[in-house]
A protein has these predicted regions:
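Flexible, membrane-associating and regulatory peripheral segments of lipid-active enzymes
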Residues: 92, 307, 370-450, 454-461
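Beta-strand-rich structural segments
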Residues: 184-201, 213, 260, 307, ...
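Short, compositionally biased P/S/T/A/G/V-rich stretches that sit at domain boundaries
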Residues: 62-64, 68-71, 162-199, 279-300, ...
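Noncatalytic modules at the cell exterior or secretory-pathway interfaces
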Residues: 81-85, 137-156
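Aromatic sugar-binding surface patches on proteins
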Residues: 117-135, 141, 232-248, 352, ...
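Lipid deacylating catalytic domains
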Residues: 24, 425-663
Length: 663
């Protein structure tokens, strides 16, 4: 039935005259390009680079009624370090009574009587957070404790979680191995033991993990359990090498929460139990190629338009797609020009990569190529495309991939007969810059202060520290980088030009805007820094997956955001070129580390994150290669409600950013 429905969609006639398609045109998408040296940067990201390393276990709690009318739950709490913490998440209810049973003596204790500290705190990202109770222990006996939760009478909250966190050096490394997150496809994960961000060779021999499985929460809320194997037959390399693999079929569109569970025994004999949480969006296969060739035709003195014929359903006409491809051509020599297509395979040379974000028009997706790249490479008109990816522009999931694709060229631009000095120009990298007219340009210049995901007014109290500024106020929103970028552009269209100072996701959205769309950023000439960001998770944050798991029980809050996951951020970055990154100046922060005391930005998120972190992002995930690192400052946290002052309240940094900003 699914195949019939899919085929019917693809055969439906396309109705192109759609207002939403027309409304996308004012965004004036750029036509990106760059030299062959950047091919590797623009290729699909290696999945293992976005892996999560977990020191925690998120254990579901479901209270059941007892004969006496009270409610009860118990579970195993594996403790592998004398310094240990756990949190209970009960959606703010206060009637959960927590006790622990010693694995050696069998004696039961209230958690409060054993804990060296018990505090109420919140776990989350910006305004999307969940309350919890944190219990910390300094001299806990290792072993499998029993944790009990009771209520007198009916509980305020029937379901929740226990989050256990250990100071043990043994971690759980896991990641999704494939990018084709499409209905009907299999989603594959692997997991293994690791330590200090590196897989240890002796762990491969010892293999602390004896059992692993995936608990998958489907978009409709149902759950399924799938075993993972270390047998060499499940995408896990060799049998008994410590790497476990498993997969499941994605039969619904929407967001999946995948929890990897792994248990076993550490080399020191203590129990090993870790989980990691991943958010995985799955979309429909809305488009397919209508031809195995692309066609190119001259559209100006310097430019070619490359067209992909596509079959699509009706919904696809309202969707933006990101195209990325490499252009290769035959060496421009008389001897090789005599060869047929099959005969020139060994004579092809790289010309450039190209990319854009666009929509379907007249059953085609179109992208442009500046013919000066062909001239630079001294290639003939015999061209082909390689490593073609056509992705949806919200999650950056590839819908179409082709290793090689012939490119039929009707004619080359006239510039082929003109002299070209070999210098790479802005037009070659970004496309033809629109001419501002009195009808299209705004008035004056401005510095835009942009917030992040699900954010409150983080810049408002400090706007006076930024001269000639305007505050972007799309608060408490959960939107993709692409939608976020378009909203910034529309807000900034009031002015002739603007620069950006951005917090959190706002930094990634601003970079996305400059990369793919013409806006006031491209006309800002005053100042030294076009885009400045503070606390931006360019490589995502593990918290995004944990929030999805909690949201399945307590409600989604602002909602799940795939662009903020480590794998989603990696997919997005695999289309951001060097020339765009170079326009970014970024800042990171963390708590002040004092050896004599426990320091943190957020008690709850510190259980998940690797030091140093700002309570939301780890320092290493806030780096952006190709951009300018303006430094890491301690004593500042991601938001105002954390243990140190919020990043946006740093007056010294704010005045400096204002003085250096483009407008």
């Amino acid at each position: 039935m699914f195949q019939k429905r899919k085929l019917l969609k693809l055969l439906l006639p396309a109705l192109i005259a759609c207002p939403l398609v027309l409304s996308a045109k004012p965004l004036q998408n750029k036509q990106l390009a760059g030299p062959p040296e950047e091919f590797e940067l623009m290729r699909q990201a290696q999945p293992e680079k976005s892996a999560l390393n977990s020191k925690t276990a998120l254990i579901p709690v479901s209270l059941q009624q007892t004969k006496d009318g009270n409610w009860y739950w118990s579970g195993t709490l594996p403790v592998d370090s004398s310094t240990f913490s756990f949190m209970t998440f009960a959606n703010g209810s206060t009637d959960w009574q927590v006790s622990l049973i010693n694995p050696s003596s069998g004696i039961s204790y209230s958690a409060d009587s054993l804990a060296t500290e018990h505090v109420s705190t919140n776990f989350g990202l910006e305004n999307s957070n969940y309350p919890g109770e944190k219990y910390s222990f300094d001299n806990l006996v290792t072993g499998n404790w029993v944790i009990e939760i009771k209520t007198t009478g009916e509980p305020e909250q029937f379901e929740g979680f226990v989050l256990a966190s250990s100071n043990s050096k043994y971690l759980l490394n896991s990641y999704k191995t494939n990018n084709d997150q499409i209905i009907g496809h299999k989603i594959h994960f692997v997991t293994q033991s690791t330590s200090n961000e590196r897989t240890l060779s002796f762990l491969r021999q010892f293999s602390p993990i004896s059992h692993a499985h995936m608990l998958v929460t489907n978009p409709d809320g149902s759950q399924n359990k799938y075993s993972m194997y270390d047998d060499g037959n499940h995408g896990d390399n060799r049998a008994n090498d410590g790497l476990f693999g498993g997969d499941f079929s994605a039969l619904q569109s929407g967001g999946y929460t995948v929890q990897i569970n792994a248990s076993g025994k550490n080399p020191d004999g203590t129990p090993f139990y870790r989980t990691s949480e991943h958010f995985v969006p799955v979309i429909e296969q809305t488009i397919s190629l209508g031809s195995n060739k692309a066609s190119a035709a001259t559209i100006s003195d310097n430019r070619l338009n490359i067209a992909f014929n596509v079959n699509h359903d009706l919904e696809a006409t309202n969707t933006n797609y990101r195209i990325i491809a490499e252009v290769w051509g035959k060496n421009n020599s008389s001897e090789q020009n005599k060869l047929s297509y099959d005969g020139v395979e060994n004579y092809m040379k790289p010309i450039s990569w190209i990319s854009t974000i666009t929509s379907i028009e007249n059953n085609q997706l179109n992208i442009e190529l500046d013919a000066r790249w062909i001239e630079m490479a001294n290639a003939s008109e015999f061209l082909e495309l390689r490593n073609v990816r056509i992705e949806d522009a919200n999650h950056f999931i590839p819908l179409i991939t082709k290793d090689k694709m012939p490119l039929t060229v009707a004619s080359l631009p006239q510039m082929k007969s003109k002299k070209f000095d070999g210098s790479i120009t802005e037009e070659m990298m970004l496309g033809e810059k629109p001419v501002q007219t009195s009808a299209t340009k705004g008035v004056g210049t401005k510095l835009l202060l942009v917030h992040g995901y699900c954010s409150s007014d983080v810049w408002g109290p400090y706007q006076g520290q930024f001269s000639n500024s305007a505050k972007f106020t799309d608060f408490n929103q959960n939107i993709s980088h692409n939608t976020f970028a378009q909203r910034i552009k529309n807000f900034g269209s009031t002015w002739n030009s603007f620069g950006v100072v951005a917090h959190s996701q706002g930094g990634a959205a601003s970079l996305h805007l400059y990369t793919y769309y013409w806006s006031g950023l491209d006309y800002s000439t005053s100042g030294k820094r076009m885009i400045q960001s503070v606390g931006t998770p360019y490589h995502g944050t593990p918290i995004a997956g944990n929030l999805a798991a909690l949201g399945n029980v307590f409600g989604v809050g602002c909602g799940y955001n795939s662009n903020l996951t480590t794998s989603g951020a990696s997919s997005w970055l695999a289309g951001i070129p060097t020339w765009a990154r170079s326009k970014v100046n970024y800042f990171t922060t963390s708590n002040t580390d004092r050896w004599w005391q426990y320091n943190y930005c957020s008690l709850a998120t510190d259980l998940f994150l690797s030091d140093p972190d700002d309570g939301v992002i780890e320092k290493f995930r806030g780096q952006l290669s190709g951009a300018t690192n303006q430094g890491h400052k301690t004593g500042w946290c991601h938001t105002l409600d954390m243990n140190y002052s919020g990043q946006t309240s740093d007056s010294n940094r704010n005045y400096s950013m204002s003085a250096n900003a483009n407008r």
